[in-house]
């Protein structure tokens, strides 16, 4: 009798990622996926944990040289190179996002960006942008697609994502498929309702933009509601 064995230590976290989403995975599981396999003596989970144990924080991983990565048990030259490449790619993505976020802080620049995203939509889309203390956009969430009246009594969903992402302020954006960006009474009501809800939670409503393909309206610029 004989048996064939093979090591697919990172298979379980891969399955969890596919079923539950990447945010459900621990740092150890994410690192195990990147490392893929362990050695005959050490599982990929043990290697991942040893790497994490050598760090005071995840940012230390970016600071490690190729040689320092290779000095860790179970990580050879190829894995060290792959890790560095993945870390650098993540860093560049974050850097690009930060630069983009910093460049759209004015209502005009943000409106132009959102016009490109929502201006040609045939249905109304309500989008919330969540910002940190540096006024950088840390998350963008489509709250709903359809009629704005649907959300009038339910600012809770908007605030749910603000709390989830620890945002200190937010910006609402929705489109008018008709092309006219003048706010309706309903738009005014939604703005007041969300602002009041934000104030109760200590969150600042920075603006509410209405966009079309070629124009925009800013509550902060044009009204005293914000």
Curated annotation (Swiss-Prot):
It comes from the Bacteria. CDD domains: MPN_DUF2466 (cd08071). Pfam families: RadC (PF04002), UPF0758_N (PF20582). One of its GO terms (molecular function) is metal ion binding. A motif (JAMM motif) lies at residues 174-187. Belongs to the UPF0758 family. PANTHER family: DNA REPAIR PROTEIN RADC (PTHR30471), UPF0758 PROTEIN YEES-RELATED (PTHR30471:SF3). This is UPF0758 protein SPJ_1027. The lineage of its organism: Bacteria, Bacillati, Bacillota, Bacilli, Lactobacillales.
């Amino acid at each position: 009798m004989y048996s064939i064995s093979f090591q697919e230590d990172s298979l379980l976290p891969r399955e969890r990622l596919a079923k539950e989403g990447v945010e459900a995975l621990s740092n150890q599981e994410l690192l195990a996926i990147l490392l893929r396999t362990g050695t005959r003596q050490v599982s990929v989970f043990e290697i991942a944990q040893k790497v994490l144990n050598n760090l005071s924080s995840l940012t230390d991983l970016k600071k490690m040289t190729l040689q320092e990565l290779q000095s860790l048990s179970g990580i050879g030259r190829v894995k060290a190179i792959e890790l560095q490449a993945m870390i650098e790619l993540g860093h560049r993505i974050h850097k690009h996002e930060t630069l983009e976020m910093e460049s759209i802080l004015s209502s005009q620049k943000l409106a132009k960006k959102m016009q490109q995203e929502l201006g040609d939509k045939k249905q109304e889309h309500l989008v919330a942008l969540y910002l940190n203390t540096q006024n950088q956009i840390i998350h963008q969430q489509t709250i709903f697609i359809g009629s704005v009246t649907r959300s009038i009594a339910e600012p809770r969903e908007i605030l749910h994502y603000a709390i989830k992402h620890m945002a200190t302020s937010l910006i609402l954006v929705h489109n008018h498929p008709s092309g006219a960006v003048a706010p309706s009474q309903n738009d005014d009501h939604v703005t007041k309702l969300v602002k009041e809800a934000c104030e109760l939670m200590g969150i600042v409503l920075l603006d509410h933009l209405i966009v079309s393909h070629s124009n925009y309206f800013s509550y902060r610029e044009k009204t005293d509601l914000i």
